[in-house]
């Protein structure tokens, strides 16, 4: 998600270990999700991340944009390795 070292919509700095996600700006009241935890599952792994950003996300065709710590925890070695995948998620 974003560029390493960049600030998210909530002011967090994106790093290799960032456990944040972005929600689409097309989501109604998307700002109300900032600070909420979201449980994300893929391939038998489950992680909890925090909504700290927003974006276009493929014109609204994607539900979440994962920061590096999240996709690494779900088993990917790089952003290019992760790409676009279907995950299960729920807001906590």
Which residues fall in each region the model found?
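Secreted/periplasmic proteins
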Residues: 1-92
């Amino acid at each position: 998600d974003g560029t390493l070292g960049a600030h998210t919509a909530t002011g967090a700095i994106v790093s290799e270990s960032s456990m944040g996600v972005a929600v689409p700006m097309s989501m109604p009241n998307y700002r109300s999700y900032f600070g909420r935890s979201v449980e994300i599952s893929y391939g038998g792994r489950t992680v909890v991340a925090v909504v700290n950003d927003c974006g276009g996300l493929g014109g609204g065709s994607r539900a979440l944009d994962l920061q590096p710590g999240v996709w690494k925890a779900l088993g990917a070695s790089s952003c290019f390795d992760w790409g676009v995948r279907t995950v299960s998620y729920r807001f906590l």
